[in-house]
Amino acid sequence: MAGRSGDSDTELLKAVKCIKILYQSNPYPKPEGTRQARRNRRRRWRARQRQIRALSDRILSSCLGRSEEPVPLQLPPLERLHINCSEDCGQGPEEGVGSSQISGESHAVLESGTKE
């Protein structure tokens, strides 16, 4: 795996094998029995899946050394965001749906909404 030492690769592979065994130990329930019995089996299966998912997250985070909480993505303030069509302006409507051309009328509507 790119950028990793061989030793951590083997640790990661062991962790992935362990997680695979956890998931294989909880097969989907068989569709037999009364409706209520099937519903109860599925409910218990989903609860076990949630536990396995939590265990898998803990195993991977300890193996990879990453934090439990996701790192928040820093976004620029909305006032600084704008639509720039300087590259694509001048192309006709035959370019298709993906065209980023903005008409003067819609640009005025966008401008009036941001001045409030």
Curated annotation (Swiss-Prot):
Region (Disordered): 27-47, 87-116
Motif Nuclear export signal and binding to XPO1, residue numbers: 73-84
Sample GO molecular function, one term: RNA binding
Pfam families, per database record: REV (PF00424)
This protein's name: Protein Rev
Homomultimerization, as annotated region: 18-26
Note: HIV-1 lineages are divided in three main groups, M (for Major), O (for Outlier), and N (for New, or Non-M, Non-O). The vast majority of strains found worldwide belong to the group M. Group O seems to be endemic to and largely confined to Cameroon and neighboring countries in West Central Africa, where these viruses represent a small minority of HIV-1 strains. The group N is represented by a limited number of isolates from Cameroonian persons. The group M is further subdivided in 9 clades or subtypes (A to D, F to H, J and K).
Domain statement: The RNA-binding motif binds to the RRE, a 240 bp stem-and-loop structure present in incompletely spliced viral pre-mRNAs. This region also contains the NLS which mediates nuclear localization via KPNB1 binding and, when the N-terminal sequence is present, nucleolar targeting. These overlapping functions prevent Rev bound to RRE from undesirable return to the nucleus. When Rev binds the RRE, the NLS becomes masked while the NES remains accessible. The leucine-rich NES mediates binding to human XPO1.
InterPro entries to which the protein is assigned, alphabetical: REV_protein
Phosphoserine: residues bearing it: 5, 8, 99
Keyword Transport applies: yes
Coiled coil (UniProt feature): none
Subunit structure: Homomultimer; when bound to the RRE. Multimeric assembly is essential for activity and may involve XPO1. Binds to human KPNB1, XPO1, TNPO1, RANBP5 and IPO7. Interacts with the viral Integrase. Interacts with human KHDRBS1. Interacts with human NAP1; this interaction decreases Rev multimerization and stimulates its activity. Interacts with human DEAD-box helicases DDX3 and DDX24; these interactions may serve for viral RNA export to the cytoplasm and packaging, respectively.
Segments carrying motif Nuclear localization signal and RNA-binding (RRE): 34-50
Keyword Phosphoprotein belongs to the record: yes
Transmembrane segments: none
Keywords: AIDS, Host cytoplasm, Host nucleus, Host-virus interaction, Methylation, mRNA transport, Phosphoprotein, RNA-binding, Transport
Function: Escorts unspliced or incompletely spliced viral pre-mRNAs (late transcripts) out of the nucleus of infected cells. These pre-mRNAs carry a recognition sequence called Rev responsive element (RRE) located in the env gene, that is not present in fully spliced viral mRNAs (early transcripts). This function is essential since most viral proteins are translated from unspliced or partially spliced pre-mRNAs which cannot exit the nucleus by the pathway used by fully processed cellular mRNAs. Rev itself is translated from a fully spliced mRNA that readily exits the nucleus.
Origin superkingdom: Viruses
Compositional bias per record (Basic residues), positions renumbered to this chain: 36-47
Chief location category: host cell
GO CC annotations, alphabetized: host cell cytoplasm; host cell nucleolus
Subcellular localization, as worded in the UniProt entry: Host nucleus, Host nucleolus; Host cytoplasm
Family: Belongs to the HIV-1 REV protein family.
GO BP term (any one): viral process
